[in-house]
């Protein structure tokens, strides 16, 4: 690892022992992946994946206290993943005891730590920090220090930013130091595709199912996807971005994809085309039958396979304003067609606080509260 004089001075302790430990951690991280140098974090905001005050992660709180005591707030403001608890969602006494008295006993104190470290705002908790309403949308080519896998793959693929699939804590250290080791998806070579995906479906593939199929096949490698522009077009409209949000999250969670290219659609694919494909790339053909095979491969994990669902959650990653409107319209249509006034399974739609605020003053927020969930407060959202 070749450090700049300033970085070497930080490692030597000129900015304090705690900062030296931060830099040493980043150096060790880079060494593990063959990085030769550090590069500056250039995005306006960071993002942290750890947003939950679990009792079991005491070492995290101790580490963050060391940063705070040393005056090492983040060099950039940051957003965070969703809070684990929302009072809008009805819970039983037992659930309240488990969630608030046993599991998330450090939530309030942890959020105080995040404030001291530099969280962007009181309600900036969302896995879709890149949405316009949340305001953490990096530009093409910017270097990030993020860990949330669905946000990383979206930023890399749809926005053209550059970010590795970092771990929690490491991502905050990159924001504190202001630089990260250069390897993998931060490099031109690391962003080239080693898989060609040929989509040959007769109907628009379901985003989550297509993403799952690709993720399980390519794992952590980079796919170049052909044929999907037939269904999505060549422009990144709000609807297309919502599709890619869900698609990318599935590639990242069912595999470990941090970047994908879609021919004629995503920015780097538009700019470079098939020059992004490495020689000897493997080919995976996906048709309707293949998607059905993948869907059928998922096991039913309920102990009682005939049990009636008690609660449904929709929105991981968090939903967009347009998705919430579309779901509301679809539910309203189906309820009317079936002579019902409310869905038979209580349902929670999850979205960023800023997205929910954007729905206020429209008919959609009240409709969702009426149709989907008997909540404590007038909202079927969290």
Question: Residue ranges of each PLM-predicted region?
Answer:
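Non-transmembrane, aqueous-exposed alpha-helical and coiled segments at domain scale
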Residues: 1-382
